[in-house]
Design a protein with these regions (language model features):
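Surface-exposed loop/turn motifs in large extracellular/passenger domains
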Residues: 1-231
Length: 231
């Protein structure tokens, strides 16, 4: 369909849609899928509706098969393969909470393959991502990890807010090859809770503007919040 409609990936009392959007979450399982939400080679298009994705991991890691083969994760939100999430003029909100005591347990971990998360909303909160890794016993506990092929794009002057807390590793990691871009809206990246030898915010990719991606010029104010950075 090309009709504007909201897409909500969450969990809880289905009779209370408002709670699914604000406080509900899909829960990971301890036997077959430890991730709260797994995006595996999927395209989500809401054509002007909002997209909300909320996931909370299981308390122990599981091994499962994805488009890239067998993996062991217990993340709040985990993406595999080529992902497209496009809200049109709607807003995008992603919330991931990871709590496993073993394996890789990150708040939000995006894909190693080329992926785009896009909104043409002009609102200051066009795109929001919040990821928390809460268990120091996990092998990996990053707040938000982009990998090197994911782009977040506010194409119509909308704002972007990315907030990550990594109890063992860095709060927010935007590695080389990844990008957080807006044509004019504010970009705020906040990191906290990092472990020894890591950073609140770690950026080697592009923030604001990247050559070759169709955003034109950018007039975005960029704010980094944290007390230890790698830039």
């Amino acid at each position: 369909t090309t009709t504007a409609a909201n897409i909500v990936v969450s969990g809880g009392n289905v009779a209370d849609v408002a709670a699914l959007i604000t406080s509900g979450y899909a829960s990971g399982m301890t036997t077959t899928m430890g991730n709260g939400v797994t995006l595996d080679g999927v395209s989500l298009n809401s054509y002007g509706g909002n997209i909300v994705i909320r996931g909370k991991s299981s308390t122990s890691v599981t091994t499962y098969t994805s488009s890239i083969g067998a993996v062991s994760n217990a993340n709040g939100i985990r993406a595999h393969g080529n992902i497209t999430v496009d809200t049109g003029a709607g807003k995008l909100s992603m919330w991931g909470y990871a709590q496993s005591s073993s394996g890789s347990s990150n708040g939000i971990e995006l894909s190693t393959s080329a992926s785009t998360y896009k909104s043409s909303s002009s609102a200051a909160d066009a795109i929001t991502m919040q990821g928390t890794a809460a268990n120091n016993a996990a092998a990996d506990a990053w707040g938000i990890y982009f990998w090197n092929s994911s782009s977040v794009l506010a194409s119509n002057g909308g704002g972007i807010s990315i907030t990550g807390s990594g109890i063992k590793n860095s709060g927010v990691v935007i590695p080389s090859g990844s990008a957080v871009l807006s044509t004019g809206g504010p970009i705020t990246i906040t990191g906290s809770g990092y472990g020894a030898g890591f950073n609140a915010v770690d950026i080697a990719g592009h923030v604001g503007l990247k050559s070759g991606i169709n955003t034109g010029a950018s007039t975005s104010d960029i704010t980094l919040v944290g007390n230890k950075f790698a830039l």
